[in-house]
Amino acid sequence: MAYKRKTWREKLADDKGLPRVFTIQPRHQKRWGRGTCAIPSPREVDALIRKIRKGRVATVNQLRAVIANKHGSTIACPITTGIFSWISAHAAAEDEAAGKKRITPWWRVLKEGGKLNPKFPGGVGEHARRLRAEGHTIRNSKLVS
């Protein structure tokens, strides 16, 4: 039997028991610190990205701060937050290709330091094009205003 690859939209809808909060284990405390870590659901990250208004941007770390605050945890997982923003971006690209007009504005999410994300649909070029269309200035794959 052939395996049917999931669409990005299906990946976005698959919460896998998330969100959840766990205590950071001693062996990970050197890197993440003491306390608790929230792992968001993919749809939770998508909903946060949808709230970013036209002309505004947010970094993945800013999204993480909102997630941690929402769940009352010390931090939000940087790995899953980044992966879920990537899934959200590709699900939005699928929606756009299907003719939907209102999609998640994935291009408004930046890496730390204002860097564009090469893993988003269309790579850095498409990321820059969409940000420029909203009035932002990009130089060396980085947002400058």
Regions found by a protein language model. Name each.
Residues 2-145:
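Nucleic acid-binding interface residues in structured DNA/RNA-binding domains
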